[in-house]
C-alpha cells in the first residue's frame, strides 16, 4: 500500500490523503484551505478529478469545510462516503447558503449522491476495508 499526503502535512486545513493499492485509490477528505493560507493550491489529481476514475472513491471524515469544501469538484461517477449525520448537517447548511453562495448549491448536489456510513460499521471499497471510528473533533460523530 502507498499513502500519499497531497495536502495537509505542513498546514492546517485543506487536507487530502490518498491510499493506493493494486490500482485502487481511496482518497480521504477534499477540503478547502483555510483563509490566510499563504499559497492557495487548487488540486487537479489523477484518479480524483481527472483520468481513470473507475477504481477511485472519496471518504469524508466530517463536515468541516477544510475536509469537505471541495467535493463539488469530484466527478459524479466517483463514490463519496460520509457519515450519515454529517451528510444531513451539511445538507442543511448548504441548503440555507445556496442562494448566496453558488458553491454551496454544488456541494448540495454532490451530497445528494453521497453514500452514508455509520461509525462502528465496517464497509468495503475495492481492496479497502473501512471501519469508521468516532472521535471528538468539535462536531458530532467525526470519524477516522
Please name every model-derived segment.
Residues 9-13, 135-140:
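A short catalytic or substrate-binding loop motif that flags glycine-/basic-rich loops and adjacent residues
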Residues 86, 90-139:
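Metallo-beta-lactamase
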Residues 1-3, 21-26, 122-131:
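Beta-strand-turn-beta hairpins that frame and shape the catalytic cleft
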Residues 11-14, 18-60, 73, 82-85, ...:
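Pre-active-site segment of Zn-dependent metallo-hydrolases
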Residues 143-144:
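Conserved small/polar residues in nucleotide/adenosyl-binding loops
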Residues 58-68, 134-139:
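Histidine-centered catalytic micro-motifs
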Residues 3, 19, 29, 62-63, ...:
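Divalent metal-coordination and catalytic microenvironments
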Residues 69-77:
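Metal-dependent catalytic neighborhoods of phosphoester/phosphodiester hydrolases
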Amino acid at each position: 500500500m502507498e499513502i500519499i499526503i497531497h495536502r495537509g502535512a505542513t498546514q492546517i486545513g485543506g487536507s487530502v490523503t490518498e491510499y493506493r493499492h493494486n490500482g485502487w485509490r481511496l482518497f480521504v477528505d477534499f477540503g478547502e484551505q483555510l483563509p490566510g493560507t499563504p499559497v492557495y493550491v487548487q488540486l487537479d489529481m489523477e484518479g480524483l478529478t481527472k483520468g481513470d476514475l473507475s477504481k477511485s472513491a472519496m471518504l469524508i471524515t466530517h463536515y468541516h469545510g477544510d475536509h469537505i469544501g471541495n467535493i463539488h469538484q469530484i466527478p459524479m461517477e466517483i463514490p463519496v462516503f460520509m457519515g450519515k449525520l454529517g451528510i444531513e448537517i451539511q445538507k442543511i447548511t448548504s441548503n440555507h447558503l445556496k442562494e448566496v453562495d453558488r458553491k454551496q448549491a454544488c456541494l448540495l448536489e454532490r451530497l445528494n449522491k453521497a453514500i452514508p456510513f455509520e461509525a462502528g460499521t465496517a464497509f468495503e471499497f475495492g481492496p479497502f476495508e473501512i471501519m469508521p471510528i468516532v472521535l471528538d473533533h468539535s462536531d458530532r460523530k467525526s470519524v477516522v
